[in-house]
């Protein structure tokens, strides 16, 4: 259950958040919202640790940010948020990721943007294999499965954030073809 910090009431995780109608692709319950907030907060903290570590020359922060980025990429590897060509049909799905990773212009946008920035700040501290893990299982997968659409059809958020996220991810992946996308 979740306790609201404002009204102090306790809510079951499956309670409809009431933000979007059930027919909206962003519709979700309170559990979805809390998990999405976790992803957004974690990736933001990774960027902050990496940036502060660089600015202050603090290897502890750089090491921790690298560790978290690699852990995140490893977890993303086995996380089926959309049916994909690479996923076995019998692979279990986690109910929350159906709506969390449809937040194209909100949650994913921020998550991918932060992952790409963190990767840029930490790339030189990783082995070739570690870089490949982050590139393939975190950045490229979110980009392919969630962000790429031929036409932006949503009115929930600003299109510039969608574009800047694709460009940031393209820079992290060193893909000039995506910058001109």
Label the model's feature ranges.
Residues 35-181:
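Aromatic-lined, polymer-binding surfaces characteristic
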